[in-house]
Amino acid sequence: MTITGWLLMYSATDTAKAHTPEEGGRKMSQGKSKKVIAAGLLVMSLTMACNSALAPILAEVGKFFPDASDSAIQIVLTLINLVTLPAMILEPFLESKITKRDIAMIGTFLMLAGALLPQVLSSQLWMLYLSSIIIGVGLSFVVVTSSSLISDYFTGLEKSRIMGFQSIFVSIGGTIIAKGSGLLTAMAGWKRGYLVFLIALPIILIILLTVPKGETTPRVEKGKG
């Protein structure tokens, strides 16, 4: 199972315990139809396989850093996965201050920011590592909040259907990102391969227009009912 698939399972199970149909009903009253919200959440999922963007550029990165070992080059890709899991612990702390929709938008923006970094800083391999770390943190925010928002707005069979469509959109997004990165790399070099993350711009706009802002989630201290 891929890291994204594992995260989807984990966050879906976790959020199913935390939300009730009543919560979803209150949030649905903000004027957005279920179809519009579902569309926004599915579009949000397009970047969940964003690590596929770096696979096509690794060979060219290796040529750019001829003294670096193969394992050192591979870290550029694996760092995204390594960062994503521990970064999940940050999201619950943010929920008490920022709405889930805004956390998802921040996560999508972080992926874009991480991808733009090599356009200006790429002379050292650690700069690409930093880029991957930023992308990984952003990915974590998107994965967790996406599944959580689905649990907020949908229940039962409807929720199961949305989760099924989400898996399809993750796959479609991964394919688009990988193909786009490979094409940009072939046409303009490995640095430009990162520009496939510009897909984040319309995604942020779509999230803003289709997903209700929602409310922050107060943290519940241990030992208190």
Residue ranges and their predicted role:
Residues F165-L209:
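Helix-loop-helix hairpin linking two adjacent transmembrane segments in secondary transporters
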